[in-house]
Amino acid sequence: MLCIKNGTLHTAVSKEPVLADILIDAGKIVEIAPQINGSFEKVIDASGLDVWPGFVEAHCHIGLDGYGSGNAGADYNETNDPVTPQLRAIDGINAMDPCLNMAAKAGITCFATGPGSTNALGGTFTAIKPNGKRVDNMIV
């Protein structure tokens, strides 16, 4: 288990940040409390540091915009028809898009990514996490 100690937590339930510890087991938060005691595999001292929850990007085109590969990898704005409901983000996501790693480092833990907004009806979005090298392992 991992324990993050003495962090200044910014949460969705309190207007003001709170000083607290966070206990994590198998990648999941299992407890948040003012003080957690015990024996842990790893302890991170977050004294003087701000701790934020993971952010969710509700509308983006990450993995679809061809960043780093140019127009050949741009799979989000189909301009050949104003109505393209058959387009599916899952079919065009580039799991190796460097933007995924950049966004994860910035604290974004989940994305709703999909076809562009050029069309009146542009297709289906997909929710993904920025980890993994294969799209089927990234799907939420």
Functional labels for PLM-detected ranges:
Residues A104-V140:
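Polyanionic/metal-chelating signatures
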Residues M1-F40, L49-V51:
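N-terminal metal-binding scaffold of metallo-dependent hydrolase/deaminase domains
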Residues L49-P115:
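Metal-associated gating/positioning segment near the N- to mid-region
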Residues I32-A33, G66, L121:
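Glycine/Thr-rich phosphate-binding loops of Rossmann-like dinucleotide-binding domains
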Residues K5, A20, A89, T124-T126:
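Structural beta-strand/beta-sheet cores of well-ordered domains, especially the beta-sheet scaffolds
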Residues F40, G73, A120-G122:
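Short secondary-structure boundary/hinge segments and terminal tails
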Residues T11, G63, N119-G122:
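Flexible loop/turn segments at secondary-structure boundaries
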Residues I4, K42-I44, V56, A112:
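Hydrophobic/aromatic beta-strand patches that form the interior of the parallel beta-sheet core
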